[in-house]
Amino acid sequence: MDPLQAVHLGPRKKRPRQLGTPVASTPYDIRFRDLVLFILEKKMGTTRRAFLMELARRKGFRVENELSDSVTHIVAENNSGSDVLEWLQLQNIKASSELELLDISWLIECMGAGKPVEMMGRHQLVVNRNSSPSPVPGSQNVPAPAVKKISQYACQRRTTLNNYNQLFTDALDILAENDELRENEGSCLAFMRASSVLKSLPFPITSMKDTEGIPCLGDKVKSIIEGIIEDGESSEAKAVLNDERYKSFKLFTSVFGVGLKTAEKWFRMGFRTLSKIQSDKSLRFTQMQKAGFLYYEDLVSCVNRPEAEAVSMLVKEAVVTFLPDALVTMTGGFRRGKMTGHDVDFLITSPEATEDEEQQLLHKVTDFWKQQGLLLYCDILESTFEKFKQPSRKVDALDHFQKCFLILKLDHGRVHSEKSGQQEGKGWKAIRVDLVMCPYDRRAFALLGWTGSRQFERDLRRYATHERKMMLDNHALYDRTKRVFLEAESEEEIFAHLGLDYIEPWERNA
């Protein structure tokens, strides 16, 4: 997900500490009129309650200073449902059966999403029906992070797309991306690891106490988390989003074929817009960059799943024309369950193909598309794979399989969707496609590597090296102690060799 699209960071306003009764509500626009919230001060404190009330109002929620008949939701922190009912009884207030008793994590998620989120079981405060409403050990539905030790390795964590901490991870992803654009490798990795571990948590962070025992959260990261808890936003991420260099590099590298070196050059030359770059006669562009500019509007828009499925059919139809027994697998984010992406990746292999047939397939397929008028751009990198070469020691090493970077013309009629991101008046869309051809005996390693996520693969290789004395890449797994290559016909076998529980593709969104 593009962090620029994923996070909404409003203006940061430092507030002095408040004492005493919370101030009256300020005249913010109420966007969600069906919900009337009351935030319970018990176990929360006056200052934090006042801050949360103010923040919720800024986000468009109606929050009452006092409990009244109009309240539909009571939100509490570190209280069980029984605690809340006991408090209501002490106030001589009878709770309506329609009144929702919710943990503060629900409101935090609402504010992160900018709208009310669905009330799940984990949000509902538990009321013990068999006793008077008093504190009952274990009855409250407040998540506890230290139930089980959390691994520092993403390959030992299950990370689905259900991110309870997006407010934090979006900010950390922006900071990581900024460091990557500046080639600050150490800081970038620290932010990426922190974001990755937060994405795996089955509960939302609502206070700094929740971060206790969680690995990969250094002092800098904890400071950022604390700032977001207090202010509802990250001043550091906001500063990056407003930074001219960051905005320029993001814009320039959004062009297919433009890397950091070219972006740096254009920035130093004083360019800030793509139109100025395209109109400058002194600049020379590669064929890839020319294609990137030509189809920019299509390529910069996300590919949705119906479009990816249509491309998958296009690829399979072409491949089996020349290799009927070939196996074509969609990899990358779409294999991990994502609904959108910036390109579509495919791994191709064949159990019966000769080495020559493997080497010729991508050439035949791209020639076939060229004859059909579907090939808008093509760059084939020939294989440099060596069967008995040990895996790379680098956790980010690229593989040596034959691969093809394409832009294909996807006709609107092939997409089974009401909306397919087409430009109005145009019957097709340019789609970025990567094809990888690998030998059949290496398919498991290639599939594991090309599925991602990037952080999952990095940690998988790091785990193999540091914990198992093995070397893993997209080609092979090598045991340095026994000095042998370990064969595998499936991803499950690779996990077994490493002594790891198998992680499904949709649980690798680290």
From Swiss-Prot:
SMART domains per record: BRCT, POLXc
Region feature (Disordered): 1-22
One Gene Ontology MF term: DNA-directed DNA polymerase activity
Reported tissue expression: Isoform TDT-L: Expressed in the thymus, and, at lower levels, in the bone marrow. Detected in both cycling and noncycling pro-B and pre-B cells (at protein level). Isoform TDT-S: Expressed in both cycling and noncycling pro-B, but not pre-B, cells (at protein level). Not detected in mature peripheral or germinal center B cells.
Cofactor names: Mg(2+)
Positions of the BRCT domain: 27-124
Quaternary structure, from the entry: Interacts with PRP19 and DNTTIP1. Forms a ternary complex with DNTTIP2 and core histone. Released from this complex by PCNA. Interacts with TRERF1.
Protein name as it appears in the record: DNA nucleotidylexotransferase
The organism of origin for this protein: Mus musculus (Mouse)
